[in-house]
Amino acid sequence: AQGSRALAQMRLEELFADARWLMSARNQKSDRKLSASRLQLRAIWPILKREIPLVLTANRAGDISRALAFAKRQQIRLVISGAAEGWKLAGPLAKAGIPVLISVDQNLPSSFDTLESRHDNAALLHQHGVRVIFHANGESHNARSLRPLAGIAIAWGLSKQAALAALTHHPATTFGLKDIGRLAPGMRANIVLWSGDPFSLKPR
């Protein structure tokens, strides 16, 4: 939503209130004016039913706190994307069981929202028990860079086991892909042999 943070939050609250109202069978044929089309509001139903998580982009600690409060009020599953200042709220994120989607090469501020981003964000979040997931800034064509980028997080304190989970098991479990993401009986998996450290640029 365009405008201030307060306006964006108000808009989100309105959308979820209307989506929840529309879920009631007795309201299906009502002519009440809604904040979005019925088709758009129905798209929110799987979130309200906790079938899928809501992914919210939030980088500032204050915005992350507001996202946590919103998810608690709505009783929905939440994933925080960005989380440049997630290290400041590692405890509350872990307590609430909220996973975070982070870009490990986001060490320099790209906006005022990311002024306090740091390389060891992933390590600090993991130390507190937060489920960390790596992404390539939302650009699918950069997915090939995730493996060496995970090496940056390792260089700044994240264990190799945790980095591997951030690329495999954690995204799979967070988004409901129950039969992939780890090596175990009954799971679908590929086994890859590397010529060296898979998190460096050199091995093939």
Question: Across the structure, where does each feature detected by a protein language model lie?
Answer:
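Short acidic active-site motifs
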Residues: 43, 88-89, 121, 182
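Short internal beta-strands
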Residues: 78-84, 101
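A general structural motif
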Residues: 36-37, 56-60, 82-84, 111-118
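Short, intrinsically disordered, charge-balanced linker/junction segments flanking boundaries
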Residues: 1, 201-204
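His/Asp/Glu-enriched, well-ordered alpha-helical/loop segment
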Residues: 53, 94, 99, 103-196, ...
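Polyanionic/metal-chelating signatures
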Residues: 1-78
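Alpha-helical scaffolding segments of alpha/beta enzyme cores, especially the outer helices
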Residues: 14, 66-69, 88, 120-127, ...
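Active-site-adjacent beta->alpha loops and helix N-cap segments on the catalytic face
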Residues: 85-95
